[in-house]
A protein has these predicted regions:
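Bacterial N-terminal signal peptides that target proteins for export
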Residues: 2-12
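Membrane-proximal, proline-rich intrinsically disordered regions
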Residues: 24-69
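Conserved, well-structured interaction surfaces
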Residues: 48-52, 56, 86-155, 175-187, ...
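Core domains of carbohydrate- and sulfate-ester-processing enzymes
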Residues: 78-86
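Substrate-binding clefts and substrate-entry loops adjacent to catalytic sites
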Residues: 167-177
């Protein structure tokens, strides 16, 4: 019986020593997956991933009930509903609600569109250098124009400079911006992207 306990003790001590001496630094190295650093778009996979994420962002705009509510209510398809916070009634464009900056989910479009525009800027700036197919850069141009169109139709004039210059990929957060006029948004961002 003694030799069995001795073997178990030796094996247990060896296993404990193995676990205590193993390094876990690789496990703790973080790989960011929700934001892009400047080197992300310097590879072909990075540019392709950026274009893929622009398609994925559509669910954050059109997948929300608030967006459907603002587009469908007042038609013969649907009428306003009610939610716990009352936002559905306020977003109703058939005249039942009172749409203001404090009573609607305008942040859903604002935040999603600008992050997608920044991704498109990164793809457009780096796509040719990486050597990807021009169609991927064209898709990024379309999405940038599409997002600016949604923004300008909803909010009027919106900023073209996200912090690094007009229509440039921004890597540092900016809390200030200058609102461009509606004609500027169309002539600098929407029409040129759709025509190239």
């Amino acid at each position: 019986m003694k030799p069995i306990f001795s073997k178990i003790r030796v094996l247990g001590t060896a296993a404990l020593a193995l676990f205590l001496t193993a390094s876990c630094s690789d496990i703790l190295d973080e790989q960011p997956r929700s934001s892009y650093d400047p080197t992300f778009f310097k590879t072909e996979k990075g540019v392709e991933g950026g274009v893929t994420s622009m398609y994925a962002h559509l669910r954050y705009i059109y997948g929300q009930a608030y967006y459907y509510n603002s587009c469908l209510t007042g038609t013969d398809e649907a009428t306003w509903g009610w939610s716990a916070d009352g936002n559905f009634k306020d977003a109703d464009l058939s005249g039942v609600g009172n749409l203001t900056a404090t009573t609607c989910r305008s942040d859903a479009l604002w935040g999603t569109a600008f992050s997608n525009i920044n991704t498109a800027n990164g793809v457009i700036e780096n796509g040719a250098e990486v050597g990807v197919n021009e169609s991927l850069v064209s898709e990024a141009r379309f999405f940038r124009a599409f997002d600016y169109f949604l923004l300008v139709q909803t909010f009027g004039g919106v900023p073209l400079d996200l912090g690094s210059g007009e229509l440039k990929f921004n890597i540092t957060p900016s809390r200030t911006s200058v609102r461009n006029t509606v004609p500027e948004v169309y002539t600098k961002a929407i029409f040129p992207d759709l025509l190239t």
